[in-house]
Amino acid sequence: MPNIKFRASRRTLTSHAGLSIIGQCFEIAGVDSIDSRFPTTLGMRTSDVIKSYLGLLCLGMSDYDAVENFRRDKPFQQLLTLQKVPSAATLRQRLEKLAANDLQARTATWSTTLLSLIEAPITAETTHVCLDIDTFVMDNSNSKKEGVSRTYQKVDGYTPIAAYLGNEGWCLGLELRPGKQHTMKESNAFLERVLPRAQCLTKQPILLREDSGFDSQAHLALLEQQRQVFADEGRRLDYVVKWNPRGSATADRDTWLAVAADYWEELRPGKRQALWTQTVSIHDDNKTEYVVQRVMRLVERTADRDGQLLLEPDYELEGWWTSLDEAPEAVIKRYQAHATHEQFHSEIKTDLDLERLPSGKFATNDLILHLAQLAYNILRLMGQLGMTGELSPVRHPAKRRRLRTVLQELVHRAALVIHKARQIIPRLRAGHRTHDGVEHLAKPPALSTRNAMLTVNRRHSIHKQFQATRDRQICRAWRVERHDKTGRQHRSARWVLAITGLRKPTCTGRMIKKCSLAVIGKVSAPASRIQVIVTTSFFLWLSVWRFCQRPCSTKSFIFLPSTSFFSA
């Protein structure tokens, strides 16, 4: 046995090298923009509190006390670009205060912004991109937390609702609900919030899949209305919702048998089924009539799979509301894939350690679930971009990696953190297969582009020295455009940015009102390394909003020297 000795080192070491990728995802999602909406006069910034807890979630930790282990961890602070790491008490108090101020409404756009800018892969199933919506149970038994009550699984806890897009399972909505709340309650409002997010991420037809808990005439009427809205925009929306037979199915058995008489087909000795499609009229709250179709399946068993004869036939009646113009077998097969989302529920509860929520207040736990939505998507993104295809670890091939696998292979990876030339370089062990995946994640297409589009907060003033006449605006913008086309630098065009896209600006002295501005231009470093610097002499707030490859236009410009407020 080798003689092993432990020694302390003054070098900066970390066992969570994957935080470097997670920190970049925070910047792209725009988490730092929360400081302007929730400013603080004393204490640490709001973004530091949020990113600290998001970092814990991305490490598979959810309790407040876990942050105490990272208060003196410099890599945790540096890789997540934190000024300070809060204590457990501060983290709890600030999250409760932010939840009372409805921070949940601000966090909804973070995931869609991240997925759209990174151009996350969204795989369709046959002809449609599936959007799965369902509730699940979080067991919080033996606790007195606010909102904990009896769930449909006969345990005390919560029943949150979630929405997942594509075969990858991108989470577009995750909201907390009391345990006793019915699935259908407030689901229409949730659907109206989720559908626009799905529209922003994919142009393909969307197939909404829901179980029998969403079977109501008001919900089906809303789906028909949303289909019309999609059609007016040149888009397509379809749905498959499991039918809830309730008590009428057994009472009208003779009627169903009479309808199925023409559709029977034998599957095996002692078992046969009938498949058919029927149209049903439904009404919304305003008594508006909608005609929808329903796929029906009636199964009759006179013997079990082992050949044992039954004393009397056993009947099973099922149905699916759908807008698909397909055969009944194809509709049923599409719905059967809906069960995959149960894996996503399990990952949220186990891999993110959110089965038992840490707070006793309902609003705070709801905020934690909203933050978990972003953490889930970040880890899912790391798995899709860094652990599939040729970058897959030595395991079975898969189209999607579990979050725990991402934590083990990419996040919990030891590294030596080096500071050099104003850069933070996590150095991994050479030759390890994980190194290729991490290096690929650090340079995805959206991060390595050299064109950056930014938005300007129009409520802040612009200093006089940065205003220009129209002639100078066009001249400076022409230099930027020429540099984009030829690659040659004209009077240090390497360090210039131009604000484009003015829509009816009204200039009054130092203020520019009623306008929408966007900054586009060349930078000499990857867009992920652009840092915003706000000074007292220049009250212009910029935030990285989008990356694009479009050349500058010369219609209406305001020229700004980028060296005044950027460092790359």
Predicted regions and their residues:
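Dynamic "connector" segments at or just before major functional cores
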Residues: 1-156, 162-182, 187-201, 229, ...
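Charged/polar low-complexity intrinsically disordered segments
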Residues: 64, 89, 467, 473, ...
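Conserved nucleotidyltransferase catalytic core and NTase-mimicking acidic/glycine-rich helix/loop elements
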Residues: 378-411
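Low-acidity, Ser/Thr- and Arg-rich intrinsically disordered low-complexity segments
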Residues: 488-495, 503-510, 515-516, 524, ...
